[in-house]
């Protein structure tokens, strides 16, 4: 029958119960207990169990932009081999780890699961403080054995979404003990007496890729301009660009379709052959022109607006104005289209 385990056994409490039982037992039982060390002393030394496959592993899962919201799993398969007669064939498993994978000051939630196919055992969300699960197997099972186990490092669905780009790492230790019996839950006790224990040191890496999404672009509207002749004052408007980036980025705004000269001078809205000058700025005072100076192929060009990114949506205000002193052209609707580029 398949076994799904959720709670580790408590070795200290079990040992107290065992010793109490021995104390209340018959003289023969007490004699057996006292004879055990002599038996072990007289028996040729047993070789300790070994992690004969994958005692040290470093494995990586790399997200893509498409699957960043999905669950991520890294399997760490290993085989514990014990050659001693008294080692036992039943198995216990445990781990020590932290519940997060870390990238500098950033982290993602992580857990460990385990599977022991030979005993139809699956364990979800293992105890992270070394609690032992098991023993799994028969009531009495002496002799050498090899047991295949898979520990899986899991980042739950959605845990990596909105996280900064980089490699998130978790290093953990697993250990497995063998016992000859499942009676009284002797998890780890038999292994401690016979050396039937083995360990593994593993590292899980989860790589979050650089990504940027342009969520919203502005439609800047100066509305109705009613002045006749040169405008007495600057006419202002504004819009918002919203991006979601998990890495440093720069937002550039192109020249538009009618700029006075490439990379310089006023941009211009048009109605047929008529033109209405305007400009786009980074600041509310309208002193820093926002364009593509420095080149859209690099991060940090002087014409753009740069930010380190947070992984969450960020909004940047685009300030627009028609300069004071502008002579208004013939009535009509004037438009221009500019290209917004996010470089990351």
Identify the residue ranges that each predicted region occupies:
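Short proline/glycine- and polar residue-rich coil/turn motifs
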Residues: 67-68, 138-147, 230, 305-312
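Outer membrane beta-barrel transmembrane domains
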Residues: 281-285, 295-302
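Predominantly extracellular/luminal cell-surface or secreted proteins
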Residues: 111-115, 124, 175-177, 254, ...
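N-terminal secretory signal peptides that target proteins for export/translocation
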Residues: 1-23
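Sec-dependent N-terminal signal peptides
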Residues: 16-34, 336
């Amino acid at each position: 029958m398949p076994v799904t385990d959720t709670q580790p056994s408590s070795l200290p409490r079990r040992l107290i119960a065992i010793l109490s039982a021995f104390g209340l037992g018959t003289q023969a039982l007490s004699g057996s207990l006292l004879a055990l060390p002599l038996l072990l002393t007289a028996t040729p030394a047993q070789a300790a169990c070994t992690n004969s496959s994958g005692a040290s592993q470093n494995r990586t899962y790399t997200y893509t932009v498409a699957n960043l919201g999905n669950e991520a799993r890294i399997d760490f398969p290993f085989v514990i081999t014990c050659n001693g007669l008294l080692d036992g064939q039943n198995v216990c498993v445990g781990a020590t780890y932290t519940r997060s994978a870390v990238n500098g000051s950033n982290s993602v939630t992580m857990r460990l699961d385990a599977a022991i196919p030979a005993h139809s055992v699956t364990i979800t969300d293992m105890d992270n403080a070394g609690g032992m699960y098991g023993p799994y197997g028969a009531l009495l099972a002496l002799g050498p054995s090899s047991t295949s186990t898979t520990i899986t490092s899991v980042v739950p669905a959605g845990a990596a979404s909105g996280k900064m780009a980089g490699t998130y790492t978790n290093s953990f230790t697993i250990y497995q003990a063998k016992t000859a019996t499942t009676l009284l839950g002797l998890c780890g006790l038999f292994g401690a007496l016979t050396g039937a224990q083995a360990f593994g040191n593993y590292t899980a890496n989860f790589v979050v890729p650089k990504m940027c999404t342009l969520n919203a672009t502005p439609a800047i509207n100066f509305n109705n301009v009613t002045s006749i002749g040169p405008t007495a004052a600057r006419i202002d408007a504004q819009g918002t660009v919203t991006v979601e980036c998990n890495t440093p980025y720069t937002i550039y705004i192109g020249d538009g379709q009618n700029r006075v000269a490439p990379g310089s001078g006023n941009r211009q809205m048009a109605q047929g052959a008529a033109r209405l000058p305007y400009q786009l700025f980074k600041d509310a005072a309208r002193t820093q022109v926002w364009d593509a100076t420095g080149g859209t192929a690099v991060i940090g060009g002087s014409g753009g607006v740069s930010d380190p990114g947070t992984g969450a949506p960020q909004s940047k205000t685009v300030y627009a104005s028609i300069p004071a002193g502008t002579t208004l052209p013939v009535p009509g609707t004037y438009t221009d289209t500019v290209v917004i580029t996010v470089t990351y």
